[in-house]
Amino acid sequence: MIIATAGHVDHGKTTLLEALTGINADRLPEEKKRGMTIDLGYAYWPQPDGRVIGFIDVPGHEKFLANMLAGVGGIDHALLMVACDDGVMAQTREHLAILQLTGQPTLTVALTKADRVDDARLTQVKAQVMATLNDYGWHDATLFVTAATEGVGVEALRDHLRQLPERTHPAGQRFRLAVDRAFTVKGAGLVVTGTALSGEVNVGDTLYLTGANTPMRVRGLHAQNQPTERAFAGQRIALNISGDAQKADIRRGDWLLSDAPPQAAERVIVTLDRHAPLQQWQPLHIHHAASHVTGRVSLLEDNLAELVFDTPLFLADNDRLVLRDISARQTLAGARVVTLETPRRGKRQPEFLAFLNELASARTDADALRLHASRGAVALATFGWARQLSAASLDALAGSGDYLQANGYLLSSALAARWQEKLLATLARYHETHSEEPGPGRERLRRMALPSEPEPLVLALIERMRRDGQLASREGWLHLPGHKAGFSEAQQALWEKIQGLFGDEPWWVRDLAREAGEEEQAMRQLLRLAAQQGFITAIVKDRYYRHDRIVAFADLIRTLDREKGATVAADFRDSLNVGRKLAIQILEYFDRIGFTRRRGNEHLLRDSALFNSAL
């Protein structure tokens, strides 16, 4: 349980906290001297049942509001202090606005300094406070009258705080901690502290430290000021860490993460909760957890907007941010992350805005995955980071729906059906325009039909279609099941007459027609039909090899690729003992069909599934 204090400067937050816990949370000499909290202070209150309630004492002065914002991320409850003599003040409202915009935690009110006012003033302040709370959405907050220096109301407040229910945190999430302090301890080394927003951490784990961009090993843990082997979301945690980083490398706003993050977000799409009007492309101060950057807002529609950061932030879906004016005097709005994936164009298209509104309303990770998958292939690593899902949770989620998965990508059944239509239509057109070929290889079909889609998914879909009988294949060549070539009776007789002429060397159509004493056009038609049936293969127009020779050439290329990393014309020519021109024709044929690809003078193996008798 983590409770944050809130309230106007000099309303007795630190004094009451000391009365509750016995600890003065002001930790800086300047704070002691001024009598006000400047930075975040912490106090821990052990309970008889073994629990430890942690308090974050935030500054009340407007000048130090950025520090206050760093303290309210990840809290379970807020304790609002209002001095009876002053009543509700500017920073009281400011703190309530910030608490509302960062998730509206449950709230308790302590009226402080009650010994300084009479009953009439106390009644007046109670009414003022309850009306103010109602304005900000707290309709049933419990209120206590206290005078910390006299001990009035302190025990009743203690009893109430002890009975507060702990906030539950989702299971199966990655560990994520926002760093708010870093220091060194003699004999232990580097220590960082912060509030864990999700997941759990164990002694011995390796975490990724942003800012320093390096992995760090967890040597020791304190949770809620108690030594432990394991700590969880919702706790104040101190981590003794070691690795390639020093105290000087760490800043407030850095993160300790269970997984190395993707690139930090330069822009995100959010929903807004406005307390004041926002203008298009208005400059802002933007607060997230312990981070504070500047940026601008691009308004999209209703409460949807895009935030563009001057300094990138490590964000996840549903993270909350607070937007303040560029002079840092007014809290303007809260924002909740809808998606980290922001297209450069088309953000205001009705279809995309409808998707964003649905996504903003998604209640579960399964709902979010379904919506993303309705628009295109989903990269599971990207989705897993955005939702902060552990590997096990992500696997379970991806396996719970009707999805096609391959190599870290996921495709919905509806989109898979659409892709299948494209593949079949492309293959039908290929048969029409390349009647002399049995069909393309899977890589070539992918590049023709779905060139911009994730390769593993397309190839997995092609394989599924092959297994289901929607596609047929021979030696890796794909064709429609109905695409079958055959000889007429006269052509069959002619083929039987000439097939014995095909030895190890290729034939030109005109030469073979002359040799057999047949018309050239009739011979050309016959050889095209023979090629469709896989008996022969054209390396260039009208020049044919017996098909088993092409298979032998493919095996040679595999050998050269394995031994030398690539095939060059000279090696290929020498191995076959043929002329350079013929060697180049053969290699260019393999490039053309996608078995190899050319890089300078080299030919690299591309689709090894071709010329495979098992396929």
Regions found by a protein language model. Give the residues of each.
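Conserved Switch II/interswitch segment of TRAFAC-class P-loop GTPases
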Residues: 58-63, 72-96, 100-124
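C-terminal effector modules of nucleic-acid-centric enzymes and ribosome-associated factors
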Residues: 5, 106, 117-121, 128-131, ...
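Conserved nucleotide-binding/hydrolysis micro-motifs of P-loop NTPases
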Residues: 61-62, 85-89, 104, 113-118, ...
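P-loop/Walker A NTP-binding module and the surrounding RecA-like catalytic core of P-loop NTPases
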Residues: 3-7, 11-20, 63-69, 87-90, ...
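Conserved catalytic-core segments of large NTP-driven translation/proteostasis enzymes
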Residues: 114, 131-276
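Residue-level signature of catalytic and energy-coupling elements of molecular machines
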Residues: 10, 16, 35, 57, ...
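G-domain G4 guanine-recognition motif of GTPases
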Residues: 83-84, 108-123, 143-152, 297, ...
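Conserved G1/Walker A P-loop phosphate-binding module
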Residues: 1-58, 205
